[in-house]
């Protein structure tokens, strides 16, 4: 009976360690919530006209633009992604993109408005941003020539 308890105890310890290691690997590289601000310079945006000629549902917007720091002076990475036009009348797109920085990537997804600031869901990350969640707000500057992106990231 004592031998059986030792085996059960050993199995429980191994399981606990396994779950503990799994939980440890699921943590983010950032230790506490952070706010990260970058500026996107929209120099490569291209709309692919699909279906009805002109601005119409289903059109695709692609981009691969440079990102600059919060002072908008030093290049810190790139941003690449795409959007599908959902409603020309409402001025909305459904978008997903990845911000690539030296220490990792952050992906976002959600609806984008041509006419107002927009909030996106942070859907994940790599590097020091592994397993982050949170939100990102986009603010158009200079008529959309630049976009201020403010990430609120939670580990």
Model-based region annotation:
Residues 9-20:
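Bacterial N-terminal signal peptides
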Residues 19-29:
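Bacterial Sec-dependent signal peptides at the C-terminal "C-region" and cleavage site
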Residues 27-155:
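Beta-strand-enriched cores of mature, soluble protein domains
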């Amino acid at each position: 009976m004592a031998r059986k308890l030792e085996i059960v105890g050993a199995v429980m310890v191994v399981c606990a360690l396994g779950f503990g290691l799994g939980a440890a690997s699921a943590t983010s590289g950032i230790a506490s919530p952070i706010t990260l601000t970058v500026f996107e310079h929209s120099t490569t945006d291209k709309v692919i006209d699909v279906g009805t000629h002109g601005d119409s549902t289903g059109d695709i917007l692609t981009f691969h633009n440079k990102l600059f720091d919060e002072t908008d002076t030093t290049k810190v990475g790139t941003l690449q992604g795409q959007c599908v036009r959902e409603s020309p009348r409402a001025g909305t797109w459904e978008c997903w993109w990845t911000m690539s920085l030296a220490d990792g990537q952050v992906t976002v997804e959600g609806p984008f408005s041509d006419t107002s600031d927009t909030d996106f869901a942070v859907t994940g990350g790599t590097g020091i941003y592994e397993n982050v969640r949170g939100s990102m707000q986009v603010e158009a500057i200079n008529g959309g020539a630049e976009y201020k992106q403010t990430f609120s990231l939670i580990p």
